[in-house]
């Protein structure tokens, strides 16, 4: 993980905007992908404000073979909308912005 993704303080780590490096990111939407390894279908849950959608599609899963998460943000500093991707592969968990 690079210093570009997190800003470390004494007791916590702050997520940094990949565009302006600001730390004022607001979460507004979440996608959860849950499936058996390499399965074509699984559970796909989208929480967007007060709306919740559940389906079996793995389209948009940031992980090619396993579970994945997407957290959508808006940034106060530059008004961009970065998406944090959380994926796993062979026991390792990866964080990256899209």
Language-model segment annotations:
Residues 2-4, 11-16, 22-68, 87:
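Short recognition patches in nucleic-acid-associated and regulatory proteins
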Residues 16-20, 75-78:
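Short cysteine-rich clusters marking metal-coordination/redox-active sites
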Residues 62-98:
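Short, compact, well-ordered microdomains
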């Amino acid at each position: 993980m690079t210093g570009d993704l997190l800003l470390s303080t004494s007791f916590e780590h702050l997520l940094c905007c990949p565009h302006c490096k600001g730390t004022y990111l607001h979460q507004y939407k979440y996608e959860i992908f849950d499936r058996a390894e390499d399965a074509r279908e699984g559970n796909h849950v989208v929480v967007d404000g007060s709306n919740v959608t559940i389906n079996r599609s793995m389209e948009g899963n940031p992980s090619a073979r396993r579970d994945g998460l997407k957290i959508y943000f808006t940034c106060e500093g530059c008004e961009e909308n970065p998406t944090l991707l959380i994926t796993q592969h062979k026991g390792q968990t990866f964080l990256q912005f899209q």
